[in-house]
Amino acid sequence: MPLSFPALIAEKLKTEKFALLDIGCSGGIDPKWRAFEPRLRALGIDASATECRRLAGLERNPDISYVAAFVSSAANKPIDLSAGPAAPLIMKIRDRMSFMRTREIREERLKDASAEEQFRHNAWELTGLADPGKPVVVPDLLTQRGWTDLDYLKIDIDGADFEILQTFDGRFDTLGVIAVQLEVNFVGTEQPHEHTFHNTDRFLRGAGFDLFRLDVRNCSTRALPARYIWPTPAETVSGRPFQGEAYYARDVLAPHRAEAGGRLSTEKIAKLAAVFSAWDVPDAAAELLIGRRETLAPLFDIDTGLDLLAAQTQANRRRPLSYRAYMATFEADSPEFYRPEGPVPTWERIKSAWRGYWHPREKRP
């Protein structure tokens, strides 16, 4: 049996590949998508020419390539680096945060640091950059490269994310996009053009997508800094919701999405279920397998898929129950689905502390 549900789906794909577009690919393609190899096709775009060269030098998959370029809504709209990566208001709010004060403290050292260290501090603007006067319009780039099918779109460029997302307006259906992952801001105004979560959410719901996961990153102010979650200055254990990661996908089982869901191929639906599993929302994947059992059954064994998803849900269990047994315990209203009432036991505190030490924000993509 495959080690994961995405690996199972990758084995069963016959005619389609898993096509991924990563806009803001510094650090590389997320390792979880490698489960689709050798049926993984990906294009990474990043403003750091230094990073794109590094990634290309390490890449062994001939179907994955990297483009060093800034992205824009128009090819004749050069990038003004002097204005900062984000809107003026966002920049002013960002400057109030403790991670920016740490950046200031380390500024001189970072100028001479390695590109890897600069990226660890999100100081990508200090690395060797692509030509800001020659940005690319991503949908046009896809056309030039012969990309007519795209499963997964990820955007994280620390600035004009919403502007770039809108360049795909009217193209999600023609490209066959099933999932979108974006960095979003929880600060800003009510203006419809700003890169904020509420504008992103409205736009993507209008394009036929629904929210399946939302990770919130809190940031403390420099007036009273909180402890950082990671070894580098970024989000903190407390503070205001500043940014986050939003995960949108096609909800093919929703009544108001039935028509669009009916246009997806069997392999697209299988890949969608694999995306849910990769996002650590295996319940959505299981619901899709059950709701589209007749459609998916010719492609792979549904019960095997459900067992893998049930095992994913029981990650802390040495011997996970099968899907059927797991559901039986739930239907029996087993105490296993609840935390005991009363004070938190000492063993649970120790277990939680140990888990928190090794996984400070577990499975965050």
Task: Describe these PLM feature segments.
Residues M1-P365:
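Phosphate/nucleotide-binding beta-alpha loop and adjacent structural elements of enzyme active sites
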